[in-house]
């Protein structure tokens, strides 16, 4: 029997959640491939992608889970929150209802995720300034109330997209991994589980291909 070699040092499962149509899939496409699709169809169930970062000569593999926002898929998508240690909870700044539903998404994530986690609240579609229904202050206050980071992004013009993901991972690394040992139960499509041991970590230095900023609660 041939044993598979694990080609990374750390594994980090992050889910992207929020109402249908807020731009979750395009945020991931912009972050992963620097692509944006006009008229992109809504996600059905769950889509999965990976991204590997090289940090201080260590490979960090991100599992990025794009979940459907429609109510009919809730029973499917919630099962994929298991083992997640990070979430981007996304709303559309031009859609008040998507903001009003944040409490629901936050509750579902906290009920199913790993006991230690980090959350980034993302007000997406910041390019739709003339149609804004949710102020930046409202987003910031919601994030502070629930102990989350906050940022506004535009998948269309790529504004703050990379920063949103990187700041979340930075928070997770320093707050959950640094000088701490954790075992993460990673659910691989519900088929099998693998325990990834996260050992003692030193302060990280990203190579020139990646930029990590200190966690922030607001941005322009």
Curated annotation (Swiss-Prot):
A lipid is attached at residues 219-220 (S-geranylgeranyl cysteine). GO terms for molecular function: GTP binding; GTPase activity; nucleotide binding. Its main location: membrane. Keywords: Cell membrane, GTP-binding, Lipoprotein, Membrane, Nucleotide-binding, Prenylation, Protein transport, Transport. It holds the Pfam family Ras. Belongs to the small GTPase superfamily. Rab family. PANTHER family: DRAB11-RELATED (PTHR47979). This is Ras-related protein Rab-11B. The gene is rab11B.
């Amino acid at each position: 029997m041939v044993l598979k070699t694990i080609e990374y040092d750390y594994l980090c499962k992050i889910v992207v959640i929020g109402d249908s149509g807020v731009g979750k899939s395009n945020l991931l496409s912009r972050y992963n491939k620097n692509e944006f699709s006009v008229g992109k169809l809504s996600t059905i169930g769950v889509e999965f992608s990976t991204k590997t970062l090289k940090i201080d000569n260590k490979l960090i593999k991100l599992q990025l889970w794009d979940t459907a926002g429609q109510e009919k898929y809730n029973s499917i998508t919630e099962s994929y929150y298991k083992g997640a240690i990070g979430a981007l909870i996304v709303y559309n700044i031009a859609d008040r209802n998507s903001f009003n539903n944040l409490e629901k998404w936050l509750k579902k994530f906290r009920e199913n995720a790993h006991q230690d986690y980090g959350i980034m609240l993302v007000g997406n579609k910041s390019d739709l300034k003339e149609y804004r229904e949710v102020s930046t202050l409202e987003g910031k206050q919601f994030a502070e109330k629930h102990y989350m980071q906050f940022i506004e992004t535009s998948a269309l013009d790529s504004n703050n997209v990379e920063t949103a993901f990187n700041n979340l991972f930075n928070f997770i690394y320093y707050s959950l991994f640094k000088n701490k040992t954790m075992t993460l139960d990673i659910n691989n499509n519900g088929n099998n589980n693998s325990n990834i041991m996260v050992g003692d970590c030193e302060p990280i230095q990203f190579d020139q291909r990646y930029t990590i900023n200190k966690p922030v609660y607001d941005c322009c």
